Amino acid sequence: MRSNRQGVYRSLLQDRRTRLLLAGLGASSLGDGLSIVTIAWLAVRIAPANELGLFVGLAVAAYTLPGVIGAVAFARLLRGRPARAMLLGHCLLRAGCLGGIALLYATGMLAPHLYVILLAGSSLMTAWGTAGQYTMLSELGGPEGRMAINSLASAQVSFATIVGPLLAGLLLVWVSPGLLLALDAATFAFLGVVAWRAGAATKAVGEPIDARAAESGFRLLRRPDLLSLTLVTWVFFFLYGPVEVALPVYVAADLQAPAGLLGVYWTTFGVGALAANLITGTIRGHNMRRITLLIIAGWGGCLVPFAFAPIPVTLAAFAIGGLIYGPFIPLTYALFQSSATAVNLPSVLAARSAVVMVSTPLGTAIGGPLVGSLGAAGTLAGSGLATLLLAVVASVLWTGERADAPKSMT
């Protein structure tokens, strides 16, 4: 297995364009890892009096949610454009807006409303940038390498999520948050340059889904296979949302433990997800939808012990949960990449991102009321049970689809 895994990755990394794109994505992921902490910390610094909690929440949301608006607003302009142009546009917008925030903060001119506006502006192309990224990955990896290249990109995100916040916490003791946002802006500029240099890969073989090239992504999402996959992904991420609220309360209130234990939970999860992403790239010739269902059920099962088990058991369950949860994103993207041809893939992925983008924030929003009524442990276990139910429903939903379609998705 190990030699097979190394062979798959070695074959991909022999291509200069693949190395360039992955290097850019890795740098950008690390920059975003820094910004997980930095954006909220800068919001704390400049928040209006008596509005700290509201303003921090608004700033964090502004860095993500306006991408839904951009997915719709820019559809006519970007439909049919090269994938690298979409990714470059996203990178330029991120770099420009984040760089503007850093400059205004350094000169003492960053007002709270300008901060939110610039964060929102930076996220307008998020859906199209993600679409461009995964279209380029699909083209570079080809049918045999999609899972592997998706997994490498996801592994970089997992690594950045582990290291970035820790590094930001250390650096913010010595440097201003504006400087770290300037660094994040530089990583996006770097990604834009290398993505453009990576160029267009060989197009996927096959006819467009419809006679028209670059058809509307939202129209294509009505296809039963794509619609069911999008719905399952949306609900899965929605059910994950309450975990982000309940786990800190579980550690602080239920266990009466220090913040360090919360860090241990998330670190074990992140390490598990990182390892799983690297392993997932070797999956070939398997029924990808069946594996996706097993991931959903497995993650749900790992949350149930929080209702009754001691700390060592829940730590082990959460680490195993990271191993199980980690491959979900590269797997589901591989399913999309194989369900649409290159001409339609960017529009489909942008529409998918616009729909899915709001799921986790909505789940997080209901996490507070759920913790208040069910308790933290009850919310974690309830999320797990609901996720297990989702696996059952999704299994029924996918029963009627063609059995040979998933096998072509590697």
How would you name each of these model-derived features?
Residues 1-19, 200-231:
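Juxtamembrane intracellular "pre-TM" segments in multi-pass secondary transporters
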Residues 38-47, 102-107, 163-183, 253-254, ...:
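Transmembrane alpha-helix termini and helix-breaking/packing motifs in multi-pass membrane transporters
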Residues 135-139, 181-209, 286, 396-407:
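Helix-loop junctions on the cytosolic side of multi-pass membrane transporters
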